[in-house]
């Protein structure tokens, strides 16, 4: 039995979908604990591409139960579209379960999200416009609509009539937008409720029952560490907690049941939206990374900003999440480069900085300090063991492991399941001790 959290160690889009899909083969249950339709993951199986936003990656395994946990925010229309997409490809959805305490994204959330972002002007955050922030804001303000409310028509009518009238004042007076018709919204969401009713459960209880039965449970994170509301590049963050601790809160389980935490990071760095990005590349190499890596957001379609690997934020992710091991993805994207740079520290106001600064204005002033490594200029997409890799590629991985102070358990070399090197068992491998504590440098594995 193992309970494992998979999180993003950068700004999201690290390839968590593929890694979770791979690990789901050994999982009895996959749990999505936070975020909403602002996060997307792409899975390629036998040439078929699945792009999902809410449904966990494990849904493609017929015997794996999938939970959309209480920390998520659910757009019923999008969720039903995903269900229809999967069913259209012959994928069973009978093992999907939705937390009754998850919050629901409403039409006014989307309107307010877009209007607020537009009103910010130069101070915009770069949101997806899907209503995620306003949904979480209502949750904190304690006026949110939860899935359990959808299941009770009388409660839903009472709550929505009051809430929509309240939101209409803001839409009209602050943003000069047309007010919503409460009865139209109520009718729409009552229809969604009936379609989703068979999937709704007490998710915390269901997860706990699986823990007591010593099942293998995979907790699938959305977005990435540097987008965390408390520990990310605030204010250019999401509205939830994508770090490992957030998986426990958003699933309704205690931290003592977690056995391992796996961090997923690209072999380079990308970011979507606004905010500081010290290693960002604006020229030919940045374009090459974007083209070879197909760096366009699953949710928004926006081009991702690309840059060199940032070891400073990598070490920060290891610390904040207590990572036991790493999965490095898209190594093959670097195949054509003659040399590769890695950020090992920052220069901040004339001083060397080895740690991530929590102040956004300081982070924006950070200049990367690079070490340059030789490239390999040969294809790695068909490599299936470390021995298959060109020596410079292997040395690059060793450098990243030592820089981040965490062993590498998985190396991904393409979108397909088989384009993967399993270095060590990522689920049942050893717990990570404090690396370097005994004076010994970390290598690719803990051996």
From Swiss-Prot:
InterPro entries: Adenylosuccin_syn_GTP-bd (IPR018220), Adenylosuccin_syn_Lys_AS (IPR033128), Adenylosuccinate_synth_dom1 (IPR042109), Adenylosuccinate_synth_dom2 (IPR042110), Adenylosuccinate_synth_dom3 (IPR042111), Adenylosuccinate_synthetase (IPR001114), P-loop_NTPase (IPR027417). Coiled coil: none annotated. GO terms for biological process: 'de novo' AMP biosynthetic process; IMP metabolic process. One of its GO terms (molecular function) is adenylosuccinate synthase activity. Pfam families: Adenylsucc_synt (PF00709). Substrate binds at residues 298-304. PROSITE patterns: ADENYLOSUCCIN_SYN_1, ADENYLOSUCCIN_SYN_2. IMP binds at residues 13-16, 38-41, 128, 142, 223, 238, 302. Binds 1 Mg(2+) ion per subunit. It is found in: Cytoplasm. Its EC number is 6.3.4.4. GTP binds at residues 12-18, 40-42, 304, 330-332, 412-414. It is an enzyme of class 6 (ligase). Pathway: Purine metabolism; AMP biosynthesis via de novo pathway; AMP from IMP: step 1/2. Keywords: Cytoplasm, GTP-binding, Ligase, Magnesium, Metal-binding, Nucleotide-binding, Purine biosynthesis. SUPFAM superfamilies: P-loop containing nucleoside triphosphate hydrolases (SSF52540). It comes from the Bacteria. The active site is at residues 13, 41. Signal peptide: none annotated. Its cofactor is Mg(2+). Plays an important role in the de novo pathway of purine nucleotide biosynthesis. Catalyzes the first committed step in the biosynthesis of AMP from IMP. Belongs to the adenylosuccinate synthetase family. Homodimer. HAMAP family: Adenylosucc_synth. This is Adenylosuccinate synthetase. It comes from Rippkaea orientalis (strain PCC 8801 / RF-1) (Cyanothece sp. (strain PCC 8801)). The gene is purA.
């Amino acid at each position: 039995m193992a309970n494992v959290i998979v999180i993003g160690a950068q700004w999201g889009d690290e390839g968590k979908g593929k890694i979770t899909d791979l690990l789901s083969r050994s999982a009895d249950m996959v749990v999505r604990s936070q975020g909403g339709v602002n996060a997307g993951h792409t899975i390629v199986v036998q040439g078929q591409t699945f792009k999902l936003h809410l449904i966990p990656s494990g849904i493609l395994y017929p015997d794996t139960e999938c939970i959309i946990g209480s920390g998520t925010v659910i757009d019923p229309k999008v969720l039903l579209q995903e269900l229809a997409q999967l069913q259209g490809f012959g994928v069973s959805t009978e093992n999907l379960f939705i937390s009754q305490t998850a919050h629901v994204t409403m039409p006014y959330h989307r309107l307010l999200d877009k209007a607020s972002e537009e009103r910010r002007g130069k101070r915009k955050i770069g949101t997806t416009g899907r209503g995620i922030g306003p949904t979480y804001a209502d949750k904190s303000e304690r006026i949110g609509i939860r899935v359990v409310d959808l299941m009770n028509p009388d409660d839903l009518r009472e709550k929505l009539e009051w809430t929509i009238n309240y939101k209409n004042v803001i839409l009209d007076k602050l943003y000069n937008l047309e007010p919503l018709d409460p009865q139209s919204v109520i009718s729409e969401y009552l229809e969604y409720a009936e379609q989703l009713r068979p999937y709704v459960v007490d998710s915390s209880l269901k997860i706990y029952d699986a823990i007591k039965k010593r099942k293998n449970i995979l907790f699938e994170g959305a977005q990435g560490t540097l987008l965390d509301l408390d520990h990310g590049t605030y204010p250019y963050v999401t509205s939830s907690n994508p770090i490992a601790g957030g998986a426990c809160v958003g699933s309704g389980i205690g931290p003592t049941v977690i056995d391992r935490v796996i961090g997923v990071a690209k072999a380079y760095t990308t970011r979507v939206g606004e905010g500081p990005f010290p290693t960002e590349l604006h020229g030919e190499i940045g374009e090459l990374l974007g083209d070879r890596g197909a760096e366009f957001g699953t949710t928004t379609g926006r081009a991702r900003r690309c840059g060199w690997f940032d070891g400073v934020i990598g070490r920060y992710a290891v610390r904040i999440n207590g990572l036991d091991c790493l999965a490095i993805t898209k190594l093959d994207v670097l195949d054509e480069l003659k040399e590769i740079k890695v950020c090992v520290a920052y220069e901040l106001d004339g001083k060397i900085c080895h740690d991530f600064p929590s102040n956004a204005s300081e982070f924006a002033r950070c200049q990367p300090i690079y070490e340059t490594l030789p490239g390999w200029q040969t294809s790695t997409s068909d490599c299936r063991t470390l021995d298959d890799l060109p020596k410079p590629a292997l040395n690059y991985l060793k450098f990243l492991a030592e820089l981040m102070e965490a062993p590498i358990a998985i190396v991904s070399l393409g979108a397909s399941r088989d384009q993967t090197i399993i270095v060590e068992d990522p689920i049942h491998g050893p717990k990570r001790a404090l690396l370097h504590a005994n004076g010994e440098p970390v290598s690719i594995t803990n051996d």
